[in-house]
């Protein structure tokens, strides 16, 4: 069961970091 939480946690971290990069990218370029 723990591996399921680990997998979901990694997916959440990946999606969050992607969202932050997409959100920051236009601000850094302008």
From Swiss-Prot:
Gene Ontology terms: cellular component: cell outer membrane; plasma membrane
Cysteine pairs bridged by disulfides in the record: none
Membrane topology (UniProt): Single-pass membrane protein
UniProt induction comment: Expressed during stationary phase and in minimal glycerol medium, at 45 degrees Celsius, strongly (30-fold) induced in low oxygen (at protein level).
Disruption phenotype: Not essential, no change in sensitivity to reductant (beta-mercaptoethanol).
Location in the cell: Cell inner membrane
Record keywords: Cell inner membrane, Cell membrane, Membrane, Stress response, Transmembrane, Transmembrane helix
Classification via InterPro entries: YbgT_YccB
Pfam family, one: YbgT_YccB
Transmembrane segment boundaries: 4-24
Coiled-coil stretches noted in the UniProt entry, renumbered to this chain: none
Family listed: Belongs to the cytochrome ubiquinol oxidase subunit X family.
Biological function: Might be part of cytochrome bd-II oxidase (appB and appC). Able to restore reductant resistance to a cydX deletion mutant upon overexpression. CydX and this protein may have some functional overlap.
Complex formation: Able to interact with CydA and CydB upon overexpression.
Stated name of the protein: Putative cytochrome bd-II ubiquinol oxidase subunit AppX
